Curated annotation (Swiss-Prot):
N-methylphenylalanine: residues carrying this PTM: 8
GO CC list: plasma membrane; type II protein secretion system complex
Keywords associated with the record: Cell inner membrane, Cell membrane, Membrane, Methylation, Protein transport, Transmembrane, Transmembrane helix, Transport
InterPro entries (UniProt xref): Bac_GSPG_pilin, N_methyl_site, Pilin-like, T2SS_protein-GspG_C, T4P/T2SS_Core, Type2_sec_GspG
Keyword Transmembrane (UniProt): yes
PROSITE patterns per record: PROKAR_NTER_METHYL
Name of protein: Type II secretion system core protein G
Cell compartment(s), UniProt: Cell inner membrane
Residue spans of biased composition, Gly residues class: 144-153
Protein role: Core component of the type II secretion system required for the energy-dependent secretion of extracellular factors such as proteases and toxins from the periplasm. Pseudopilin (pilin-like) protein that polymerizes to form the pseudopilus. Further polymerization triggers pseudopilus growth.
Organism: Dickeya chrysanthemi
Post-translational modification: Cleaved by the prepilin peptidase.
Amino acid sequence: MERRQRGFTLLEIMVVIVILGVLASLVVPNLMGNKEKADKQKAVSDIVALESQLDMYKLDNSRYPTTEQGLGALVKKPTTPPEPRNYPQDGYIRRLPQDPWGAEYQLVSPGRHGKIDVFSYGPDGMPDTDDDIGNWNVGNGAHNNGGNGNGNP
């Protein structure tokens, strides 16, 4: 017996390619938007967690770390004044997270937007741009009293 093999015609292959192209043009932008949202949400979660640990630091030591001491004060006891009086042996966190774009989170204490400012420079990595994500614009309102950190605007 003779078997006859039949393949796809060029037209059928072209139709499949066009359909895949149309699907890709619809799906890829949605996926990219979700990645941006997920990155921003991770930054917000990290900032809220860092803020919580900074509050613990303040409870133990009656003040937040200074800008110079930075967020590293949560990992290792600062040796620059003012040195914390009641620092836990293992620190407040094991290591500092990086923001979703591979940069370090920032601390300004006292903050420009509240008692402390904890923030990421955002996707562009540049300071003082519209895409910065900070505790003053994440919606929890815990430290964004709109002033200089002492309750006065």
